Amino acid sequence: MDYTNAIHIIPDAAGPDAWANAAAQGGDAGIWATEDDYNSQWNADGGGGGSSRAGSEQPPPGKKSRGGGGGEGGGNTSKSRAIGKMFFKTKLCCKFRAGTCPYVTNCNFAHGMEELRKPPPNWQEIVAAHEEATEAREEHQIPIMTSSGPTAGGDAGCGGGGGGGSGRAYKGRHCKKFYTDEGCPYGDACTFLHDEQSKARESVAISLSPSVGGGGGGGSYNSAAAAAASASAAAGNGPMQKPSNWKTRICNKWEMTGYCPFGSKCHFAHGAAELHKYGGGLVDIDSRDAAATPDSKQAVVSAKAPAETAAASTTVLPHADVYHLGVQAQRSTIAGQRSGQVQRPIQKWKGPDKISRIYGDWIDETE
């Protein structure tokens, strides 16, 4: 086969003396690409990718490269590429002159005077504006700050601010330890907010709130009220005004265990001698006993009522189905447990006589 026409060599249009006289025509040696220019081309291509590779190795247009980040990093890369395109083939390739250019037709520098281009006339202003925008973006980035001061042992609500404000301040959030009896161990160095007025206002609101859950909720209300009183005392607000429901009920903890951790600060009475009226004033013991007598009688009557109801419910059971003895015994046990409910009389099975007229194809044996 004849391979003479397989390769067609195109001579340099500028002639053999164009490379030798390029510096003289350009006026200075700046027309030739330097090592810095090659390095910038390498970085702009992403470490050897992009325009430095053949078209078959480049990713498809719809697919993002693995190393390319989105957001602000992607914007910087696109602007850098725009600057690189502005200087595309504006300098002559020294490696092509030496015969060692690895980029061949994908090189960003001119491989001859016919490929040489001129940059835009205002290229210096464009480059300066790009550098200023890059510096301003770096200044507005939030630095990662580490705190060298002590930390509050595992508590996210309080943190030490050591190192002269080296830690990030969270003055918009309230300190959790500041509202406890012990107080915040960091004091003014704490990075969270210490609000004296809100502390006093919160303690008064807790003490004036009504009790929750009736008699069973005395313990929890007692704890909240005592904590509010101690917090108010720690804040230096002086003696707090007693609420209208002060010691109007017996303390559950004191009545069950004989001990209350709050002592004299408890909002509930420790015995009949400490009982107060609603709004203030001690309760008269004689009138309290007289008022308690009807309650005891009512309790005796209410205790007798379930027993009578249970007896009435058990009398209905013998009229139930006598053919199911096991079910009858079980029903009697359930009826004994449900003493407070009214037992329905259990109706006896009517047999097929009552349902023989439901279906049209039923054969009535009586006919």
Curated annotation (Swiss-Prot):
Matching entries from SMART domains are given as: ZnF_C3H1
- Give, as residue ranges, the zinc fingers classified C3H1-type: 87-114, 169-197, 245-273
Recite the UniProt keywords alphabetically.
DNA-binding, Metal-binding, Repeat, Zinc, Zinc-finger
In terms of Pfam families, this protein maps to:
zf-CCCH, zf-CCCH_4
Task: Name the residue ranges with Gly residues bias.
Answer: 67-76
**Where is the region Disordered?**
38-80
Its domain of life reads Eukaryota
The record, for Gene3D superfamilies, names:
Zinc finger, CCCH-type (4.10.1000.10)
MF terms (GO), sorted A to Z: DNA binding; mRNA binding; zinc ion binding
- Provide the coiled-coil residue spans: none
**Entries under SUPFAM superfamilies matching the protein:** CCCH zinc finger (SSF90229)
Q: Which PROSITE patterns match?
A: ZF_C3H1
Q: What is this protein called?
A: Zinc finger CCCH domain-containing protein 56
